[in-house]
Amino acid sequence: MYSIPCILFAGGKSSRMGENKALLPFADKKSLTQYQYERLNEIFDDVYIGTKEPQLFDHIDASFIDECCHPNIYAPTIGFVSAFKQLKKQKALFVLSVDAPFVNKTMIDAFQAVELGDYDAIIARTQSGIHPLCGIYSRSLELPLHKMIQEDNHKLGQLLKNSNVLYIDIEDEELLMNVNTPDEYQKALKKVAGE
């Protein structure tokens, strides 16, 4: 079990899905969020769900990161700032998007095997690009994140470009498959069922 807290981001708009993807049934669980939470709870001592609407997840006995400080902004920047504010004693956070259900323990172990040291972040990268919502973020990014919010800039790629980042190269693109559209959801359901 890892002592670094894990933040499961489940507060996105889900505009491409047409409904809240965090609440879609997944595998044998009531929701994708429950599936992710229970999996991550076997790897990390503390798992938090980041959302503006914790009442939507009352089917999960979980702790939440309250993202209500900016009710009209649906962006991970808000989740990061809220998490750093709520978890004052933590020097770093492991983050994962709710819509990446195939990130496994072996992959998480690869992040944990690296010393954060002077890095601002340790982020997953595949051949298709970087995956900002899969990795470790240092508290050193808290002030830059606040500044981004003040400037109404929510592009994590830009933050990472201006930071000291170690990228973990992941060969298998499928591990970072996102569930953003109805087609991707159906594909993920088949994959998790072993079809």
Language-model features, listed with the residues they occupy:
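Nucleotide and nucleotide-moiety/phosphate-recognizing core
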Residues: 1-141, 146-153, 158-175, 183, ...
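Active-site rim beta-loop-alpha module in soluble metabolic enzymes
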Residues: 180
